[in-house]
Amino acid sequence: MERIVVTLGERSYPITIASGLFNEPASFLPLKSGEQVMLVTNETLAPLYLDKVRGVLEQAGVNVDSVILPDGEQYKSLAVLDTVFTALLQKPHGRDTTLVALGGGVVGDLTGFAAASYQRGVRFIQVPTTLLSQVDSSVGGKTAVNHPLGKNMIGAFYQPASVVVDLDCLKTLPPRELASGLAEVIKYGIILDGTFFNWLEENLDALLRLDGPAMAYCIRRCCELKAEVVAADERETGLRALLNLGHTFGHAIEAEMGYGNWLHGEAVAAGMVMAARTSERLGQFSSAETQRIITLLTRAGLPVNGPREMSAQAYLPHMLRDKKVLAGEMRLILPLAIGKSEVRSGVSHELVLNAIADCQSA
C-alpha cells in the first residue's frame, strides 16, 4: 500500500494507493459509524462498483444514499449538478454529510463542486476509477463544471478529505480511457521530471498491459509530483500553472469539437505537441525532444495532431477565454527541456497559429 500526504496545513489529506481498497472499510476514513453519505457515480460505473462500495460503507455503519448521473463529459454541466443538489435536499442531507465521488474526472470534478457549494461547503472524498483521475484530477482540489463557451469555467478550489485509489478499477477501464490517462502521466515527465519521462519510455508497454508494480509506481510518482506542486501553490498563482501543459490548446479542441467527442487526455496529448512546436519556433526546445514526446504519445495510442476539421484560427477564441489569460494576453505552458517548463506570456498569435498548423492532421 502506498500513502502520500498532500500537505496543506489543517486541510492536509492522504492519498491511499493499493489493490483491494474497496473491500476495506478503513479505506474510507475519516468516515465513521452513524455518519451520512451521498455516493455520486455514473450509469457506467454503478453496475460495476456501486453495490460494493455501498456495502463496505454500510459495513462500517455509515448511512448511504446514492445518485447516479449520466456518463460523459457533456454531462459535466450546471443542469446535472442540480440533480445532485436535488438528491441531497430531498433526503435531506445537512452540513454534516459527506459526498463520495466514485468515478472519473467528470464525476470527481462535479461532485467536488457540489460539495464546495452545498450549504456553503460539506466534506467530500475522491474515489477515482480512471487512470486520468487517479493521477491528476482527484488530487489538488480543482472542482468545476463546464460552460458551452469554455471548459471548467464554473468552479472552486475545494480540497477533498481523502483520495482512495483502488488499482483494481483499471481492470475495467476501456483501452481508449487508459490511453487518455497516460497523456496526463506523460505530462508530468515533460514538465517536472525528466527521469520519470525516461522511465516511461522504458516501461510504457508494462503500463499498457496493466502490470501491477509498474502501474503502482507510475500512479504514486504522479501523485507525489502533483502533491508537491499543490502544497507549494494551491490556488495556481505560479508553479501550479505548469500542470496545464497542453491544456490551453486541448481545452480549445474539447470546446470546439463538442465535449466528449475528444477525450480530455486525447486533446491534451495533441495540445502538448502544439506547445512543443510553439517552444521550438521560439528557439527554446529542440525538434529531437519534440520527437521523443510524439513517439511516446503515439506508443500510448494518443493523437499528436489536432482535428482535421478544426482550423488553426478556430483555436484562438477559446484560448483567449482560458483561465490563465491575464490582461487579455495568453499565458502558455511551454517545455524548455524534457523535465523543465515555463509559463510564457507575449507569444504572438501568428507564431501560435503557425505552431498549431504544424500539428494539423494531413
Swiss-Prot record:
Q: Which InterPro entries match?
A: Dehydroquinate_synthase, DHQ_synth_AroB, DHQ_synth_fam, DHQS/DOIS_N, DHQS_C
What the record notes about the co-factor is: Binds 1 divalent metal cation per subunit. Can use either Co(2+) or Zn(2+).
Give GO terms for biological process. Answer: amino acid biosynthetic process; aromatic amino acid family biosynthetic process; chorismate biosynthetic process
The pathway this protein participates in, as annotated, is: Metabolic intermediate biosynthesis; chorismate biosynthesis; chorismate from D-erythrose 4-phosphate and phosphoenolpyruvate: step 2/7
Q: Which reaction does it catalyse?
A: 7-phospho-2-dehydro-3-deoxy-D-arabino-heptonate = 3-dehydroquinate + phosphate
Q: Which residues are noted in the entry as NAD(+)-binding?
A: 71-76, 105-109, 129-130, 142, 151, 169-172
One GO molecular function term? 3-dehydroquinate synthase activity
Q: Where in the cell is it found?
A: Cytoplasm
- Residues binding Zn(2+) are 184, 247, 264
Q: What is its EC number?
A: 4.2.3.4
Broad class of enzyme this protein falls into = lyase
What keywords are assigned to this protein?
A: Amino-acid biosynthesis, Aromatic amino acid biosynthesis, Cobalt, Cytoplasm, Lyase, Metal-binding, NAD, Nucleotide-binding, Zinc
Q: Which domain of life is it from?
A: Bacteria
**Cellular component GO terms, alphabetical:** cytoplasm
Q: Does the keyword Zinc apply?
A: yes
Indicate whether NAD appears among the record's keywords.
yes
- Which cofactors does this protein require? NAD(+); Co(2+); Zn(2+)
Which purpose does this protein serve, as stated in its record? Answer: Catalyzes the conversion of 3-deoxy-D-arabino-heptulosonate 7-phosphate (DAHP) to dehydroquinate (DHQ).
Question: Can you tell me which family this protein belongs to?
Answer: Belongs to the sugar phosphate cyclases superfamily. Dehydroquinate synthase family.
Show the HAMAP family listed in the entry. DHQ_synthase
Q: What is this protein called?
A: 3-dehydroquinate synthase
